[in-house]
Protein backbone atom coordinates (compact mmCIF):
# COMPACT_ATOMS: atom_id res chain seq x y z
CA UNK A 1 0.00 0.00 0.00
CA UNK A 2 1.11 3.56 -0.58
CA UNK A 3 -0.02 5.41 2.53
CA UNK A 4 -0.43 4.64 6.19
CA UNK A 5 -4.06 3.94 6.98
CA UNK A 6 -5.95 2.07 9.65
CA UNK A 7 -9.34 1.33 8.14
CA UNK A 8 -12.05 -0.17 10.30
CA UNK A 9 -11.81 -3.95 10.23
CA UNK A 10 -14.79 -5.75 8.76
CA UNK A 11 -15.12 -9.35 7.71
CA UNK A 12 -17.83 -8.93 5.08
CA UNK A 13 -19.36 -6.29 2.85
CA UNK A 14 -19.73 -2.85 4.37
CA UNK A 15 -23.00 -1.00 5.05
CA UNK A 16 -23.53 1.74 2.47
CA UNK A 17 -24.68 5.27 3.09
CA UNK A 18 -27.87 6.71 1.65
CA UNK A 19 -28.17 8.98 -1.38
CA UNK A 20 -26.45 9.18 -4.75
CA UNK A 21 -23.07 7.75 -5.52
CA UNK A 22 -19.83 9.57 -4.76
CA UNK A 23 -18.12 8.60 -8.01
CA UNK A 24 -16.33 5.67 -9.56
CA UNK A 25 -13.54 3.27 -8.67
CA UNK A 26 -11.22 2.16 -11.48
CA UNK A 27 -8.63 -0.58 -11.07
CA UNK A 28 -5.69 -0.88 -13.44
CA UNK A 29 -4.16 -4.32 -12.94
CA UNK A 30 -0.73 -4.17 -14.55
CA UNK A 31 2.15 -6.62 -14.65
CA UNK A 32 4.04 -4.87 -11.84
CA UNK A 33 1.46 -2.72 -10.05
CA UNK A 34 -2.24 -2.57 -9.29
CA UNK A 35 -3.45 1.03 -9.25
CA UNK A 36 -6.82 1.82 -7.69
CA UNK A 37 -8.18 5.22 -8.71
CA UNK A 38 -11.07 7.21 -7.29
CA UNK A 39 -12.93 9.46 -9.70
CA UNK A 40 -15.58 11.96 -8.65
CA UNK A 41 -18.96 12.22 -10.37
CA UNK A 42 -17.53 14.71 -12.90
CA UNK A 43 -14.81 12.29 -14.01
CA UNK A 44 -11.88 13.93 -12.21
CA UNK A 45 -9.29 11.58 -10.68
CA UNK A 46 -9.16 12.58 -7.02
CA UNK A 47 -6.73 10.05 -5.57
CA UNK A 48 -4.96 6.77 -6.27
CA UNK A 49 -3.75 3.77 -4.27
CA UNK A 50 -0.94 1.47 -5.39
CA UNK A 51 0.03 -2.08 -4.51
CA UNK A 52 2.34 -4.62 -6.08
CA UNK A 53 0.90 -7.17 -8.48
CA UNK A 54 1.54 -10.54 -6.83
CA UNK A 55 -0.15 -13.46 -8.55
CA UNK A 56 0.01 -15.70 -5.49
CA UNK A 57 -1.80 -13.31 -3.14
CA UNK A 58 -5.11 -14.28 -1.55
CA UNK A 59 -8.59 -12.79 -1.69
CA UNK A 60 -8.07 -11.64 1.91
CA UNK A 61 -5.05 -9.59 0.83
CA UNK A 62 -7.03 -7.81 -1.88
CA UNK A 63 -9.91 -7.20 0.55
CA UNK A 64 -7.53 -5.52 2.99
CA UNK A 65 -5.98 -3.37 0.27
CA UNK A 66 -9.36 -2.34 -1.12
CA UNK A 67 -10.62 -1.36 2.34
CA UNK A 68 -7.44 0.64 2.92
CA UNK A 69 -7.89 2.40 -0.43
CA UNK A 70 -11.53 3.24 0.26
CA UNK A 71 -10.60 4.56 3.70
CA UNK A 72 -7.86 6.70 2.19
CA UNK A 73 -10.31 8.05 -0.41
CA UNK A 74 -12.73 9.09 2.33
CA UNK A 75 -15.36 6.62 1.12
CA UNK A 76 -15.04 4.27 4.09
CA UNK A 77 -15.89 6.00 7.35
CA UNK A 78 -14.52 5.28 10.81
CA UNK A 79 -17.85 3.80 11.83
CA UNK A 80 -17.53 1.24 9.02
CA UNK A 81 -20.08 2.86 6.73
CA UNK A 82 -19.20 2.88 3.04
CA UNK A 83 -20.30 5.76 0.83
CA UNK A 84 -22.30 4.61 -2.18
CA UNK A 85 -20.13 4.06 -5.27
CA UNK A 86 -21.65 4.54 -8.72
CA UNK A 87 -19.69 1.70 -10.32
CA UNK A 88 -16.38 -0.13 -10.34
CA UNK A 89 -14.41 -0.87 -13.52
CA UNK A 90 -11.36 -3.10 -13.92
CA UNK A 91 -8.77 -3.02 -16.69
CA UNK A 92 -6.46 -6.01 -16.41
CA UNK A 93 -3.53 -7.52 -18.25
CA UNK A 94 -3.00 -10.14 -15.51
CA UNK A 95 -5.89 -12.63 -15.83
CA UNK A 96 -4.42 -14.85 -13.10
CA UNK A 97 -5.68 -12.53 -10.34
CA UNK A 98 -8.93 -11.30 -11.92
CA UNK A 99 -11.18 -13.71 -10.03
CA UNK A 100 -9.56 -12.93 -6.67
CA UNK A 101 -9.85 -9.17 -7.17
CA UNK A 102 -13.45 -9.51 -8.35
CA UNK A 103 -14.43 -11.53 -5.28
CA UNK A 104 -12.68 -9.07 -2.97
CA UNK A 105 -14.60 -6.17 -4.53
CA UNK A 106 -17.92 -7.96 -4.16
CA UNK A 107 -17.12 -8.92 -0.55
CA UNK A 108 -16.19 -5.35 0.43
CA UNK A 109 -18.63 -3.23 -1.59
CA UNK A 110 -21.41 -5.50 -2.77
CA UNK A 111 -20.75 -4.19 -6.30
CA UNK A 112 -19.95 -6.54 -9.18
CA UNK A 113 -17.19 -4.85 -11.19
CA UNK A 114 -17.29 -4.39 -14.95
CA UNK A 115 -14.22 -5.49 -16.90
CA UNK A 116 -13.14 -2.98 -19.54
CA UNK A 117 -13.31 -4.86 -22.83
CA UNK A 118 -12.60 -4.67 -26.54
CA UNK A 119 -16.32 -4.10 -27.10
CA UNK A 120 -16.18 -1.05 -24.83
CA UNK A 121 -13.19 0.30 -26.73
CA UNK A 122 -14.66 -0.23 -30.18
CA UNK A 123 -17.59 2.00 -29.31
CA UNK A 124 -15.12 4.89 -29.06
CA UNK A 125 -12.20 4.15 -31.38
CA UNK A 126 -11.71 2.25 -34.64
CA UNK A 127 -8.97 -0.37 -34.26
CA UNK A 128 -7.21 -1.07 -37.55
CA UNK A 129 -4.81 -3.88 -36.65
CA UNK A 130 -4.64 -7.63 -37.08
CA UNK A 131 -6.32 -9.50 -34.21
CA UNK A 132 -7.65 -6.58 -32.10
CA UNK A 133 -8.47 -9.10 -29.35
CA UNK A 134 -4.73 -9.50 -28.70
CA UNK A 135 -4.25 -5.81 -27.97
CA UNK A 136 -3.63 -5.19 -24.26
CA UNK A 137 -6.37 -3.40 -22.36
CA UNK A 138 -3.85 -0.85 -21.14
CA UNK A 139 -2.96 0.10 -24.71
CA UNK A 140 -6.64 0.28 -25.65
CA UNK A 141 -7.36 2.63 -22.76
CA UNK A 142 -4.31 4.78 -23.56
CA UNK A 143 -5.45 5.17 -27.16
CA UNK A 144 -8.97 6.19 -26.16
CA UNK A 145 -7.66 8.67 -23.60
CA UNK A 146 -5.32 10.21 -26.17
CA UNK A 147 -7.98 10.45 -28.87
CA UNK A 148 -10.68 11.88 -26.62
CA UNK A 149 -8.53 14.38 -24.72
CA UNK A 150 -5.81 15.34 -27.22
CA UNK A 151 -7.15 14.50 -30.67
CA UNK A 152 -5.61 12.91 -33.75
CA UNK A 153 -3.07 12.14 -35.06
CA UNK A 154 -1.28 11.05 -31.92
CA UNK A 155 1.61 8.99 -30.60
CA UNK A 156 1.15 7.41 -27.16
CA UNK A 157 4.11 6.19 -25.09
CA UNK A 158 3.30 4.04 -22.05
CA UNK A 159 6.32 3.36 -19.85
CA UNK A 160 5.60 0.50 -17.50
CA UNK A 161 6.95 -3.05 -17.29
CA UNK A 162 7.17 -2.73 -21.06
CA UNK A 163 7.58 0.51 -22.97
CA UNK A 164 4.84 0.57 -25.59
CA UNK A 165 4.13 3.01 -28.38
CA UNK A 166 0.67 3.35 -29.89
CA UNK A 167 -0.18 5.28 -33.04
CA UNK A 168 -3.44 7.00 -33.98
CA UNK A 169 -3.68 8.27 -37.55
CA UNK A 170 -5.23 11.49 -38.81
CA UNK A 171 -8.65 9.78 -39.13
CA UNK A 172 -8.61 8.86 -35.45
CA UNK A 173 -7.98 5.15 -36.06
CA UNK A 174 -5.59 3.13 -33.91
CA UNK A 175 -3.20 1.62 -36.46
CA UNK A 176 -0.64 -0.22 -34.32
CA UNK A 177 2.64 0.45 -32.58
CA UNK A 178 5.68 -1.05 -30.92
CA UNK A 179 6.57 -2.96 -27.72
CA UNK A 180 10.00 -2.74 -26.07
CA UNK A 181 11.49 -3.72 -22.69
CA UNK A 182 10.62 -1.24 -19.97
CA UNK A 183 13.15 0.88 -18.12
CA UNK A 184 13.20 -1.21 -14.93
CA UNK A 185 12.86 -4.44 -16.90
CA UNK A 186 16.00 -3.57 -18.86
CA UNK A 187 17.92 -2.70 -15.70
CA UNK A 188 16.84 -5.93 -14.01
CA UNK A 189 17.98 -7.94 -17.02
CA UNK A 190 21.39 -6.24 -16.93
CA UNK A 191 22.01 -6.87 -13.24
CA UNK A 192 20.68 -10.44 -13.49
CA UNK A 193 22.59 -11.53 -16.58
CA UNK A 194 25.84 -9.59 -16.04
CA UNK A 195 27.41 -10.66 -12.75
CA UNK A 196 29.55 -7.52 -12.36
CA UNK A 197 26.73 -5.03 -12.95
CA UNK A 198 24.89 -3.97 -9.77
CA UNK A 199 21.23 -3.27 -9.13
CA UNK A 200 20.82 0.53 -9.29
CA UNK A 201 18.23 3.22 -8.78
CA UNK A 202 17.08 5.22 -11.80
CA UNK A 203 18.69 8.62 -11.39
CA UNK A 204 20.30 11.18 -13.67
CA UNK A 205 24.07 10.54 -13.73
CA UNK A 206 26.49 13.27 -12.71
CA UNK A 207 28.16 12.97 -16.11
CA UNK A 208 26.56 12.13 -19.46
CA UNK A 209 29.65 10.13 -20.39
CA UNK A 210 29.78 7.92 -17.32
CA UNK A 211 33.00 7.84 -15.32
CA UNK A 212 32.18 4.74 -13.33
CA UNK A 213 29.91 1.71 -13.65
CA UNK A 214 27.01 3.37 -11.84
CA UNK A 215 27.09 6.48 -14.04
CA UNK A 216 27.48 4.38 -17.19
CA UNK A 217 24.36 2.38 -16.33
CA UNK A 218 22.39 5.48 -15.35
CA UNK A 219 23.36 7.31 -18.53
CA UNK A 220 22.63 4.29 -20.68
CA UNK A 221 19.17 3.69 -19.27
CA UNK A 222 18.03 7.33 -19.12
CA UNK A 223 19.63 8.89 -22.19
CA UNK A 224 19.53 5.63 -24.13
CA UNK A 225 15.79 5.22 -23.55
CA UNK A 226 15.15 8.90 -24.32
CA UNK A 227 17.10 8.59 -27.58
CA UNK A 228 15.20 5.42 -28.49
CA UNK A 229 11.88 7.20 -27.96
CA UNK A 230 13.02 10.22 -29.98
CA UNK A 231 14.22 7.94 -32.76
CA UNK A 232 10.94 6.03 -32.91
CA UNK A 233 8.97 9.28 -32.98
CA UNK A 234 11.15 10.54 -35.83
CA UNK A 235 10.30 7.42 -37.81
CA UNK A 236 6.56 7.56 -37.05
CA UNK A 237 5.82 11.25 -37.67
CA UNK A 238 6.28 11.17 -41.48
CA UNK A 239 3.44 8.62 -41.70
CA UNK A 240 1.03 10.87 -39.78
CA UNK A 241 1.36 14.33 -41.28
CA UNK A 242 1.36 17.56 -39.30
CA UNK A 243 0.30 18.55 -35.77
CA UNK A 244 1.01 15.20 -34.16
CA UNK A 245 0.23 15.07 -30.44
CA UNK A 246 2.70 13.05 -28.38
CA UNK A 247 1.55 11.86 -24.97
CA UNK A 248 3.45 9.78 -22.41
CA UNK A 249 2.09 7.92 -19.41
CA UNK A 250 3.06 5.08 -17.09
CA UNK A 251 5.07 4.78 -13.91
CA UNK A 252 8.47 5.25 -15.54
CA UNK A 253 7.65 8.21 -17.79
CA UNK A 254 8.86 10.84 -15.32
CA UNK A 255 12.34 9.31 -15.27
CA UNK A 256 12.93 9.70 -19.01
CA UNK A 257 10.58 11.99 -20.90
CA UNK A 258 12.19 15.26 -19.79
CA UNK A 259 15.40 14.11 -21.54
CA UNK A 260 13.66 13.58 -24.88
CA UNK A 261 14.12 16.21 -27.60
CA UNK A 262 10.49 16.09 -28.73
CA UNK A 263 7.71 18.03 -27.02
CA UNK A 264 5.94 15.29 -25.09
CA UNK A 265 3.01 15.74 -22.71
CA UNK A 266 3.04 13.58 -19.58
CA UNK A 267 -0.45 12.54 -18.52
CA UNK A 268 -0.24 10.12 -15.60
CA UNK A 269 -3.99 9.52 -15.66
CA UNK A 270 -4.32 8.89 -19.42
CA UNK A 271 -5.32 5.24 -19.04
CA UNK A 272 -7.98 6.01 -16.45
CA UNK A 273 -9.38 8.77 -18.65
CA UNK A 274 -9.68 6.31 -21.50
CA UNK A 275 -11.42 3.70 -19.36
CA UNK A 276 -13.91 6.26 -18.08
CA UNK A 277 -14.69 7.49 -21.61
CA UNK A 278 -15.29 3.95 -22.84
CA UNK A 279 -17.42 2.78 -19.90
CA UNK A 280 -19.45 5.84 -18.94
List the predicted regions and their residue ranges.
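Short glycine-aspartate micro-motif
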Residues: 24-28, 89, 154-158, 247
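Glycine-rich phosphate-binding/hydrolytic loop that grips phosphoryl groups
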Residues: 195, 264-280
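Phosphate/pyrophosphate-binding loops at sites that engage ATP/ADP/AMP, CoA/4′-phosphopantetheine
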Residues: 66-87, 232-244
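Glycine-rich phosphate-binding loops at beta-strand->alpha-helix junctions
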Residues: 33, 91-98, 242-260
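Short glycine-rich, Thr/Ser-proximal phosphate-binding strand/loop in the N-terminal lobe
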Residues: 2, 23-68, 173-198
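Phosphate-binding/catalytic loop of phosphoryl-transfer enzymes
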Residues: 111-115, 124-193, 223-232
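Intrinsic disorder/low-complexity segments
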Residues: 1-23
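Adenine-nucleotide phosphate-binding core of ATP-dependent small-molecule kinases
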Residues: 55, 205-245, 252, 263
Amino acid sequence: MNKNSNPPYTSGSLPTGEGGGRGRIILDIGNSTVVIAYSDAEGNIKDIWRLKTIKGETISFFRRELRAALYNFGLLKKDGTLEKIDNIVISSVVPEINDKVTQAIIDVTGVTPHFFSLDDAQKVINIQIESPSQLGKDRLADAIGALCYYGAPAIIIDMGTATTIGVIDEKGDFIGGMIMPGVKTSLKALSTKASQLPTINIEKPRHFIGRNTLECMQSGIIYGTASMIDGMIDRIIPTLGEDVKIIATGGNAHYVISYCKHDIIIDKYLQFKGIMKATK
